[in-house]
C-alpha cells in the first residue's frame, strides 16, 4: 500500500502541537509517511511568541523529518487547509489531514491509508473521517459506514 502524505496544520498552540506530533509518532506508518507541516502566521503581534514556539517544537520533535511551510502572515485555517490539501492532492493524489489539537490513536494512519486505498474508486466517497460522533446504536458495530456529512477531526481525501 502506498502511504498518503500527512498534512499537519499548526498555528499558535504549542502544547497542543506537541501532543499531536507525539501521538502521530506512535502510529507505525508515521516513520514511512511524507509529512508536511503548514504553520500559519500570527494574526497580531500578541500571537508571535506562541507561533514561534510552535515552530520550535516542530523543529525539536521532527527536525528534517518534516517539510515545514511557514506562512509569513495569517492565512486563517480555512485558506491554509484549502491551499495545503490542494497542493498535496495535486502532487500525490491523496492526503491525510491533521490539525494541531488532535491526539490520534496508534491505528489512525493505518485506518485512513487503508480506507483511501479501499474507497479510492468509489464515487460515493469524497472524504474519509477518522472521527465518529457517539451514536449509541452504532457503537457495538465498530465499523466504517457511509454518512452524508463530513467531520474535520482527522480526515483524508483524494
Language-model features: where?
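An acidic/histidine-cluster motif and surrounding catalytic segment
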Residues: 1-97, 102-157
